[in-house]
């Protein structure tokens, strides 16, 4: 059942205390209760640039994230506000407001770089907010983007000869969409006398300079990083909302008191975010919900705190460990529920129980397959198989015990009157043995006619009859109407009957063993069938993701070539060839 969101305001998600980042347990608890998929929008920018105002607008509130009206930075760490998505039913909009970059009070660029990296890692849409035009100063202030190769790893164990830049070639596959918001923008949008849209202005501003000097490289590096890491880009410009003196009361002012152009620009920005920001997903198309976002936050923050680099692959594997373990328990619970509803012990035959087990097992595997992902070496599915086998054996044992109890109770009811008659000496007389045998046959017939005795019916009966052999023999020996020869013949008949019953029981035992072996093979085949289907689906999903990444890289390479940057185009071409090689291997991969 969908969880309800009752966040009346933002809460600190990642605290920044004395330069140390820590996840806030209260915020994590809120995330852990949200089961719906999440669209995560993070905003980053220099302090005192009005980031919080835009986030409050996205939340549909006038107040929430602290605006602050002095040169002092208000937001510390990363703050979170979860609200129902206004355009996507069944989705949650998660707004992440970050502390201002370049706060003079901190004097620690390291800290800013981690905040920037975390915002990128956690979001599906990354908003960079700045004042004025995109000039070199604005680009210099965005040097954090050039730090990402030193702050994030995509793979946990990159090849030994693979450097940070090569590892960063995978960033595009999981990085968010990029939105640049330009505040207090007062210039006309044009280049070479031609009017530009905000998006064209951004593309124009990201053009590279030809040249190999240090100055040229400094100019090009942030632009190259933005183009390479964030292929999907959008730009919005905002006029100054009010006169500078009224900015301090911005959250108290009505829209009618603001510049109409600004009001429309904010509305356009919000509309774009609501309609175009995608659901946060992980490799394999896994949609992020509250518990998954909670796990990502913990994994990344713990990595930073311990001096490691946040790693996308490690974060996904840590999440998979948690979810796959839960998937095993969910599958077992489903199996137990189904067996509890369907099975009535004792079953008439072992096969009846095994058929019910097979149906419930198939459903349990389906539950696991739906709920699991990244099950490296299929360890969790093997664990599920072992637990299901144990559950099956437990049911077989319970079935056996239920049958034994039922049959023992029946024997007591059916045969106790005969035992009482024997004790009373009714059969200790001439011709008594034949009467006894006839009565015994009648009672055995009555026993066989009783329903739902289960799989122990014959064994329990034969054990009972064997325990009464001395009583039967005593009646035989005292019957004076029988000759010694007739007694010998009768003894042999009883022995033969007993031997025949034993042989029948042995046959039955062998048949049960064969049925159990057949069931084990069927279980193995069912696991293999569903696993094969899942692996094929995962392969197709990964190929789709790689094809999307390939298209974006080809587009960027073509643009670099068009602009005349041969060296950068060659680097991109190498990345493309590496990706195409991986895709060819993936396409050729067959599951045997």
Swiss-Prot record:
Keywords: Antiviral defense, Cell membrane, Cytoplasm, Cytoplasmic vesicle, Golgi apparatus, GTP-binding, Hydrolase, Immunity, Innate immunity, Isopeptide bond, Lipoprotein, Membrane, Methylation, Nucleotide-binding, Phosphoprotein, Prenylation, Secreted, Ubl conjugation. Isoprenylation is required for proper subcellular location. Phosphorylated at Ser-156 by PIM1 in absence of infection, inhibits GBP1: phosphorylation promotes interaction with 14-3-3 protein sigma (SFN), leading to GBP1 retention in the cytosol. Dephosphorylated in response to infection, liberating GBP1. GO terms for biological process: cellular response to interleukin-1; cellular response to tumor necrosis factor; cellular response to type II interferon; cytolysis in another organism; defense response to bacterium; defense response to protozoan; defense response to virus; innate immune response. A lipid is attached at residue 589 (S-farnesyl cysteine). Changing residue 587 to R: In 8KR mutant; abolished ubiquitination by S. flexneri IpaH9.8. It is a lipid-anchor. Changing residue 48 to A: Abolished GTPase activity. Residues 1-311 are annotated as: GTPase domain (Globular). Residues 590-592 form a propeptide. It catalyses: GTP + H2O = GDP + phosphate + H(+); GDP + H2O = GMP + phosphate + H(+). There is a cross-link at residues 207, 209-210, 382, 562, 567, 573, 587 ((Microbial infection) Glycyl lysine isopeptide (Lys-Gly) (interchain with G-Cter in ubiquitin)). Residues 35-278 form the GB1/RHD3-type G domain. GO terms for molecular function: actin binding; cytokine binding; enzyme binding; G protein activity; GDP binding; GDP phosphatase activity; GTP binding; GTPase activity. Its EC number is 3.6.1.-, 3.6.5.-. Changing residue 51 to A: Loss of GTPase activity. Constitutively monomeric. Expressed throughout the cytoplasm, loss of vesicular accumulation. Impaired ability to promote pyroptosis in response to T.gondii infection. The modification Phosphothreonine is found at residue 590. Changing residue 76 to A: Abolished GDPase activity. It is an enzyme of class 3 (hydrolase). Induction: By IFNG during macrophage activation, and by TNF and IL1B. Changing residue 153 to A: Abolished phosphorylation by PIM1. Transmembrane segments: none annotated. One of its GO terms (cellular component) is extracellular region. Belongs to the TRAFAC class dynamin-like GTPase superfamily. GB1/RHD3 GTPase family. GB1 subfamily. This is Guanylate-binding protein 1. It comes from Homo sapiens.
């Amino acid at each position: 059942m969908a969880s309800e969101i009752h966040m009346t305001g933002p809460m600190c998600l990642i605290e920044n205390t004395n330069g140390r980042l820590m996840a806030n347990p209260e915020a994590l608890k809120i995330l852990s209760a949200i089961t719906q998929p999440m669209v995560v929008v993070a905003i980053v920018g220099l302090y005192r640039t009005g980031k919080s105002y835009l986030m409050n607008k996205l939340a549909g509130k006038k107040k929430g994230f602290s605006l602050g009206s002095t040169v002092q930075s208000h937001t510390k760490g990363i703050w979170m506000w979860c609200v129902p998505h206004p355009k996507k039913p069944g989705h949650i909009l998660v707004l992440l407001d970050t502390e201002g970059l370049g706060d003079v009070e901190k004097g620690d660029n390291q800290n800013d770089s981690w905040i920037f990296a975390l915002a990128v890692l956690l979001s599906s849409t990354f908003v960079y907010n700045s004042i004025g035009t995109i000039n070199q100063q604005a680009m210099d202030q965005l040097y954090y983007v050039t730090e990402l190769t030193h702050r994030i790893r995509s793979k946990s164990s990159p090849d030994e000869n693979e450097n940070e830049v090569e590892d960063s070639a995978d960033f595009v596959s999981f990085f968010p969409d990029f939105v640049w918001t330009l505040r207090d923008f007062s210039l006309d949008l044009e280049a070479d006398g031609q009017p530009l849209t905000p998006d064209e202005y951004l593309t124009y501003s990201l053009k590279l300079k030809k040249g190999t000097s240090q100055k040229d490289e400094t100019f090009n590096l942030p632009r190259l990083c933005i183009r390479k890491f964030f292929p999907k880009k959008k730009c919005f410009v905002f006029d100054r909302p009010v006169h500078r003196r009224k900015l301090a009361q911005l959250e108290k002012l009505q829209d009618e008191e603001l510049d109409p152009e600004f009001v429309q620009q904010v509305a356009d920005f919000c509309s774009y975010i609501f309609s175009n920001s995608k659901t946060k997903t992980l490799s394999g198309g896994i949609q992020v919900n509250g518990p998954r976002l909670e796990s990502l936050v913990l994994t990344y923050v713990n990595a930073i705190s311990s001096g490691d680099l946040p790693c996308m692959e490690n974060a996904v594997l840590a999440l998979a460990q948690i979810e796959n373990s839960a998937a095993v328990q969910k599958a077992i619970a489903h199996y137990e529920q189904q067996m509890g509803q369907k099975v009535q012990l004792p079953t008439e035959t072992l096969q009846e129980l095994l058929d019910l087990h097979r149906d419930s097992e198939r459903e349990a595997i389906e539950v696991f397959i739906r709920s699991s992902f990244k099950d490296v070496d299929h360890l969790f599915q093997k664990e599920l198989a072992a637990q299901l086998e144990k559950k099956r054996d437990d049911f077989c044992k319970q079935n056996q015990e239920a049958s034994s109890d039922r049959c023992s109770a029946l024997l007591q009811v059916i045969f106790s009157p005969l035992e009482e008659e024997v004790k009373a000496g009714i059969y200790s007389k001439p011709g008594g043995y034949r009467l006894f045998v006839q009565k015994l046959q009648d009672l055995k017939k009555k026993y066989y006619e009783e329903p739902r005795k289960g799989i122990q019916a014959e064994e329990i009966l034969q054990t009972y009859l064997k325990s009464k052999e001395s009583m039967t023999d005593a009646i035989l020996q005292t019957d004076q109407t029988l000759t010694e020869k007739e007694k010998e013949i009768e003894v042999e008949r009883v022995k033969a009957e007993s031997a025949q019953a034993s042989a029948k029981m042995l046959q039955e035992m062998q048949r049960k063993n064969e049925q159990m072996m057949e069931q084990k093979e069927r279980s193995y085949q069912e696991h293999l069938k569903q696993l094969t289907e899942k692996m094929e689906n995962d392969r197709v999903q990964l190929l789709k993701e790689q094809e999307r990444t390939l298209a974006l890289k080809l587009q960027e390479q073509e643009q670099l070539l068009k602009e005349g940057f041969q060296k950068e185009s060659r680097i991109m071409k190498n990345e493309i060839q590496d990706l195409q090689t991986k895709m060819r291997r993936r396409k050729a991969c067959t599951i045997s």
